[in-house]
Amino acid sequence: MISTVKRGRPTKQNVVVEFDSNSVQLFRGSDLTFSDSLFEPMTTGTELDVILSTEGGVMPGTNMMLAGGPGSGKSTIVLDMLSKFTQQGLKVLFVSGEMDEIAHYKYCKRMPHIDCVQTLFLKNYSNNVKETLEFIFNEGYDVIAIDSIAEVLEMYKDAYRTTESAAELWFLGLQDKHKKGGNSRNYYTTFINIQQMTKAGDFAGSNRLKHMVDAFCHVTRSKDGLERSLYFSKNRDCDKDFKVFFSIYNGGVHYAFETANQND
């Protein structure tokens, strides 16, 4: 008996999605209620505060993106911010998907003031990244930084054999939940997400990731490496248009700002 093998694309299967029309709700702004703590900025005490929000500083319940090329200074800026928040008694977490313990230790030796930042080395939990992050985030934090989105999504896809789209939906949904205080201590968590840019200067991620954040910050470095800057192309919490220049030396980060529309 000769067996035959069917070739071509597999037959599409219809997926039945249950929908309850009674679950759909409409709101007016007057219907919404949140704590007034949403309007209390978390300040760094640096020039960064000017472009982070109109009030001056990072606002609670916000998710922002820091995007830039390799070596532009993204991780350094974020760790510098987190160290200043930690020293004020805020509860922060740095989720490191790229650096391991040795790399982070060397980083702290070069910049001693960041060694106070509580850090999760996500590579140690790559087989259960979903469960790990959901457990840790539920502890409640003022600020959580993700370094980087690309690494978290890749770990999720590998661990659960799923698609980029499914990984993004989980990732964005998790942040949305905790922004709104959906954790054991009702923190309106702010997320600072790090993402790479390609050598051509394009965003290395989907449009969904780019547009579903409250603020998008570009971190740049000149070809000769002498000038670094950051500016927001989108920031729902700030009405100012400034570019902040920064340099890294003597174990610290030093900032100065200028209006973005001035000639460089």
Region spans (language model):
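The Walker A/P-loop phosphate-binding site
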Residues: 2-7, 12-111
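A short acidic, amphipathic alpha-helical/loop segment
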Residues: 81, 132-134, 173, 205-208
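Short loop/turn elements that form and flank the Walker-type P-loop nucleotide-binding site
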Residues: 59-60, 88, 138-140, 186-188
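Short, flexible loop motifs at catalytic/binding sites
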Residues: 19-24, 29-31, 137-140, 151, ...
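Catalytic-core regions built around general acid/base machinery
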Residues: 81, 166-183
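Short beta->alpha connector loops
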Residues: 72, 126-128, 197-200
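Conserved inter-motif catalytic segment of the P-loop NTP-binding fold
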Residues: 69, 88-173, 259
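Phosphate-binding/switch region of NTP-binding enzymes
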Residues: 176-264
